[in-house]
């Protein structure tokens, strides 16, 4: 067995079950394990939602139980500058960003990684992400998590080989029920804690109310694909392609019973376009992506077949990548896809291996 006793690993302790069990598993593997709790958002005293203090208490309880030291660090300024301001800019532009991906890139695998190495003397960091690292080719590769239902490689496509090589993912080889079982056997306070959802580090606030604090709403018309105005939206930023709930336009006399869906956001006209049922305008033959990141840092310079996900937990879509230049690619799906959303990420796979991805700039209904 490898002697890990001289290797220090800093685990990002979120106060959740996955990072708790990750810390325990690393201890079992003989590493010197310490925890780090990151505070990345400054709570407003008037804000009803405040989980950071509870999460910190849970992380501390777990570290005490496991006999681990817990460090704390405040990355709120870095989060605001490098993640949140970009998030607001994207919403202002009528796009739908994914801040969790940017948070992983800028905070967890940059600010945290650098702090752990430089200030705490760590060889590795570890997180509770459901992904795997594979070193069998001589280059660290990012693989999907074993539990396909919890796989989080979609959120980590911006990692470089170097970052993957400096990171450990102890629960990536486990299924979620097994992780909970381990936590229960250890009687950890986080064993039955529900998984967090909502924006990375901002949590489960009412999204509309939260966004309204930072961006003034701009009401505008809701139009059918035929140009008929049938209602008013409170702001394009509150809507995303494929959305059917919360439109407030049901039960119209001149329409069928079929559900209404958002099929487009026309930012220049501040207009939300809707249609009933499986309307062709909701579907795309492909997309253009930019701001590309390849895990091995090698641009794709020739057409390549692989699979793509255009949102988390989506089934793999067989596709063809056609490079336009080193920064931009055209992606053609084998079959039309619904609700391909500008601002979201397209993430590419070769079997179990996460190749990388980019930001969806536009979708198209005929190859462009």
From Swiss-Prot:
Residues at which ATP binds: 12-19, 38, 128
Reactions this protein catalyses: S-sulfanyl-L-cysteinyl-[protein] + uridine(34) in tRNA + AH2 + ATP = 2-thiouridine(34) in tRNA + L-cysteinyl-[protein] + A + AMP + diphosphate + H(+)
One Pfam family linked to the record: tRNA_Me_trans_M
Positions of the UniProt region annotated as Interaction with target base in tRNA: 98-100
Cellular localization per UniProt: Cytoplasm
Residue segments, region Interaction with tRNA: 150-152, 311-312
GO cellular component: cytoplasm
Disulfide bonds: 103-200
CDD domains: MnmA_TRMU-like
GO molecular function: ATP binding; tRNA binding; tRNA-uridine 2-sulfurtransferase activity
Active-site residue numbers: 103, 200
Family annotation (Gene3D superfamilies): Adenine nucleotide alpha hydrolases-like domains, HUPs, Translation factors
Example of a GO biological process term: tRNA wobble position uridine thiolation
EC numbers on record: 2.8.1.13
Site (Interaction with tRNA) location in chain: 129, 344
Biological role stated in the UniProt entry: Catalyzes the 2-thiolation of uridine at the wobble position (U34) of tRNA, leading to the formation of s(2)U34.
NCBIfam families tied to this protein: PRK00143.1 (NF001138), trmU (TIGR00420)
Family, as annotated: Belongs to the MnmA/TRMU family.
UniProt-recorded name of the protein: tRNA-specific 2-thiouridylase MnmA
Gene: mnmA
